């Protein structure tokens, strides 16, 4: 787990200049390239919809950044209250990205909030491999002597194991000698998610958790092969999205990209927005220092901002037993806007209606919740699903535009 000191909310100068970087895959004689990798749907043979504990999801997100999990949230995790139906509900579909590792294709979560590539492996007991595609070191793989990794989260989930160097291919671009963290121990929380075979981190390599020597992320390994050292994310609401590596796809967004400088001193895609607004209300000039994180579902903000939002939601209340703010499912939620320079990044209200507390419940849990005094905000999938976001390692900087 990465320990994060509290960060002061310091405004960063933002601009809305148009990108001068490549806007489509190139076929140069120097073998540089760009590629798009699409997420896939993977259905599992379960009876009824897939469920997940909202308090567990929430507490894991806090712990990921070294935050303190409040007592009421720990209690909600322990009690099992607040089990939500994950979205999208129909057919129990989860969105993952195929990655070929050592000749085996695994379906991984791409996570801009971490820097490890860890996978289910043949080192796990057979019972824990069931339902998963697992990593088997190729004939060209080599084990890194003395290297190990160990992750744990606030909901009690954990994984650990050995480290190999092997061939990793995403969308036709190959990383030779890429560090692959092979799980030999894993908690039930991960085992039970039969859709997911591991994680590919896209934060900065400085926070890779391999010991004694941190390893390089897949992106840092391959970025010199790309037309431009960037990737762009298009997550979708209740639909598969895509990742563009090495180029910006102008067909996927409207208007011009608004750029924000990134502070990578703690290894994250951290930036500062200028303010926010709720519904059709006036913009509030209140700097929001946050992290763009595809590996976190929720948007987690300072209490005063969260409270200001739910004051505009009829019937909303902060329910300790559920782990956070809830409201009647039929409530029409206002949009939430993050102000980035002269650009307004709008989260539609329907994206903020995260899910029912449990199957058949008329009470729903919100996709915007408190950061519990973390000292910075987390802008997860609830925010990202309405945006085309460019993660540009030159600068570094983030570019935002509304999805087309």
UniProtKB/Swiss-Prot annotation:
CDD domains: Aspergillopepsin_like. GO terms for biological process: proteolysis. GO terms for cellular component: extracellular region. Residues 21-77 form a propeptide. It comes from the Eukaryota. It is an enzyme of class 3 (hydrolase). Residues 95-401 form the Peptidase A1 domain. Its main location: secreted. This is Aspergillopepsin-1. It comes from Aspergillus oryzae (strain ATCC 42149 / RIB 40).
């Amino acid at each position: 787990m990465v320990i994060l000191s509290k960060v002061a909310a310091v405004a960063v100068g933002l601009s809305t200049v148009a990108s001068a970087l490549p806007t489509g895959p190139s076929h140069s004689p120097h073998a540089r390239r760009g590629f798009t990798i699409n997420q896939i749907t993977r259905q599992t043979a379960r009876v009824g919809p897939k469920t997940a504990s909202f308090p567990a999801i929430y507490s894991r997100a806090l712990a990921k950044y070294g935050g303190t999990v409040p007592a009421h949230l720990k209690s909600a995790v322990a009690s099992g209250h607040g089990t939500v139906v994950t979205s999208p509900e129909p057919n129990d579909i989860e969105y993952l990205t195929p990655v070929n590792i050592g000749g085996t294709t695994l379906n991984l979560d791409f996570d801009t909030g971490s820097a490890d590539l860890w996978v289910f492996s043949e080192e796990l007991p057979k019972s824990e491999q069931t339902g998963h595609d697992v990593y088997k070191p190729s004939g060209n793989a080599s084990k890194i002597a003395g290297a190990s990794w160990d992750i744990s989260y606030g909901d009690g989930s954990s994984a650990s194991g050995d480290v190999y160097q092997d061939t990793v291919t995403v969308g036709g671009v190959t990383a030779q000698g890429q560090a692959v963290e092979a799980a030999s121990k894993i908690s039930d929380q991960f085992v039970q998610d039969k859709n997911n075979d591991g994680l590919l981190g896209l934060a900065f390599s400085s926070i890779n958790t391999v010991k004694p020597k941190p390893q390089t992320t897949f992106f840092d390994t391959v970025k010199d092969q790309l037309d431009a050292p960037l990737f762009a994310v298009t997550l979708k609401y209740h639909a598969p999205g895509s990742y563009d590596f090495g180029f910006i796809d102008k067909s996927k967004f409207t208007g011009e990209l608004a750029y924000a400088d990134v502070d990578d001193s703690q290894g994250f895609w951290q930036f500062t927005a200028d303010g926010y607004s709720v519904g059709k209300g006036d913009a509030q000039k209140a700097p929001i220092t946050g992290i763009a994180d595809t590996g976190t579902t929720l948007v987690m903000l300072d209490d005063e901002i969260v409270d200001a939002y739910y004051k505009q939601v009829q019937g909303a209340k902060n329910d300790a037993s559920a782990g956070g703010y809830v409201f009647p499912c039929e409530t029409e939620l206002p949009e939430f806007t993050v102000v980035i320079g002269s650009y307004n990044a709008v989260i539609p209200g329907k994206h903020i209606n995260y899910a029912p507390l449990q199957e058949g419940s008329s009470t729903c849990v919100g996709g915007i919740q408190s950061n519990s005094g973390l000292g910075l905000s987390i802008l997860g999938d609830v925010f990202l699903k309405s945006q085309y976001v460019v993660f540009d390692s030159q600068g570094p900087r983030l570019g935002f535009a509304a999805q087309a």
